[in-house]
């Protein structure tokens, strides 16, 4: 903020030092043009200047602006710039806190599902059976209890909305809650009578709405952060449970099928729902998805052996991206994009960690998974490390991806990737 204010004063000073000739306002070499350009950058004025539109660099945007379609070019450029820096070595698994999960939460097992980064810099581990929402300070690696919850799978996942507020996705609970991460206050939004296992995670869309991913419910519900109201999309989903939602720069949410067989697509600008004809087979075959800057949505297996991606730049063509080595059941739950350009599916019962190259889809087998039913979800840290959300694993772990680059705060917090 101080930097922008200083720059603004400098621009004003320059404008008063010019000779007042406005005939060359559109001459790119003129002082008037440069001053106007700098001023527009400081105040984030995106209107056209002499036929050109100012694009604010991704790292100068707020995270609430990164998922607006008009800003995708800058976000893509920033992410790909970090990708190009590559890795410094082989990944390592690190136990970053000596306390056990059971000691911290009081929950014997299946503590968390999902994690988010908040604007205060902390990692928020979202509850499954844990009676607490736990925060991790990435600098000190210390933990705190942010809020108390019933801890009976009331929620599965959550979404970071505007102003640092996390919206928890109701699963067995009929109440919609939000957590203000500025003061860790948990607030009841409203209650609605719903069936069991209602929703799995959510997505913060460019229209300001939090869309909840249907699980037991077929109705796509949303919370409008601008109006403070709960609403629903007219067209329901069908065919079974969806495990995850993926946002694209076109403002579309792709619901990843779990027991359902087809991907359903919600256009958040029209709130119309369409499907991709390709069958993923249901049977809990798939569990997660993630968007990559080349326009792909990688679909992460749960019980299936094949990894697919949806090419959103080629009419949503579904492409076979490879096979999981020694595939089993209940393999992964969640996936994280790292600054080295690799995807890291989060192992649940799979024997190892793996990585998938987002450019050529190469699958690499990494270190052993130290437990079973281990983790569900994770989130990227400031140095490219992934904080794992412990499910039955009784320890606090991070995966050091050895990324040379890093994502700035606005990208790390972006609704494209900071979700479950």
Question: Where on the chain are the PLM-derived regions?
Answer:
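Repeated scaffold domains used in trafficking and secretory/extracellular systems
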Residues: 69-77, 109-116, 152-159, 196-203, ...
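Bacterial Sec-dependent N-terminal signal peptides
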Residues: 14-60
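Short loop/turn segments immediately following the C-termini of beta-strands
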Residues: 87-88, 128, 171, 215, ...
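A short loop-to-beta-strand structural motif that recurs across blades of beta-propeller domains
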Residues: 92-94, 131-134, 174-177, 218-221, ...
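Conserved beta-propeller blade signature
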Residues: 82-85, 123-125, 166-168, 210-212, ...
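Surface loop/turn motifs at the tips and blade-to-blade linkers of beta-strand repeat domains
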Residues: 65-67, 104-108, 147-151, 190-194, ...
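Short loop/turn segments that connect beta-strands within beta-propeller blades
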Residues: 96-99, 137-141, 180-184, 224-228, ...
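Blade-level signature of beta-propeller repeat domains, shared across WD40, Kelch, NHL, RCC1
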Residues: 376-420
């Amino acid at each position: 903020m101080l930097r922008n204010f200083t720059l603004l004063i400098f621009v004003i000073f320059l404008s008063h030092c010019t000779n007042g000739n406005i005939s060359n306002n559109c001459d790119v070499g003129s002082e008037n043009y440069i001053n106007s350009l700098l001023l527009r950058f400081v105040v984030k004025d995106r209107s056209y200047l002499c036929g050109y539109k100012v694009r604010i660099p991704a790292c100068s945007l707020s995270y609430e602006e990164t998922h607006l379609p008009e800003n995708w070019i800058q976000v893509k450029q920033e992410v790909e710039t970090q990708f190009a820096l590559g890795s410094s070595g082989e990944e390592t698994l690190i136990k970053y806190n000596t306390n056990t999960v059971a000691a911290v939460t009081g929950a014997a097992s299946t503590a968390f599902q999902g994690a988010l980064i908040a604007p205060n810099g902390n990692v928020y581990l979202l509850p499954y059976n844990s009676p607490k929402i736990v925060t991790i300070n990435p600098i000190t690696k210390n933990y705190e209890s942010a809020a108390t919850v019933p801890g009976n799978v009331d929620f599965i996942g959550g979404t970071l909305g505007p102003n640092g507020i996390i919206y928890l996705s109701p699963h067995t609970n009929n109440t919609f809650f939000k957590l203000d991460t500025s003061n860790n206050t948990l607030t009841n939004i409203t209650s609605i009578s719903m069936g069991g296992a209602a929703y799995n995670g959510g997505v913060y869309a460019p229209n300001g709405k939090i869309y909840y991913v249907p699980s037991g419910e077929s109705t796509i519900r949303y919370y409008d952060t601008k109006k403070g109201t709960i609403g629903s999309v007219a067209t329901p989903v069908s065919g079974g449970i969806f495990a995850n939602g993926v946002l694209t720069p076109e403002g579309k949410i792709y619901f990843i099928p779990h027991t359902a067989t087809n991907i359903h697509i919600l256009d958040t600008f029209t709130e119309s729902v369409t499907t991709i004809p390709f069958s993923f087979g249901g049977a809990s075959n798939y569990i997660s998805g993630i968007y990559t800057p080349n326009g792909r949505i990688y679909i992460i297996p749960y019980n299936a052996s094949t990894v697919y991606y949806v090419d959103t730049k080629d009419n949503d063509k579904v492409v076979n991206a490879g096979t999981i080595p020694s595939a089993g059941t209940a393999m992964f739950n969640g996936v994280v994009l790292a600054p080295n350009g690799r995807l890291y599916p989060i192992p649940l019962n799979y024997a190892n960690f793996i990585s998938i190259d987002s450019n050529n889809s190469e699958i690499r087998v990494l270190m052993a998974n130290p437990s079973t039913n281990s983790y569900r979800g994770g989130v990227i840290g400031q140095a490219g490390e992934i904080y794992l959300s412990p499910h039955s694993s009784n320890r606090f772990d991070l995966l050091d991806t050895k990324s040379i680059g890093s994502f700035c705060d606005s990208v790390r917090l972006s609704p494209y990737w900071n979700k479950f």
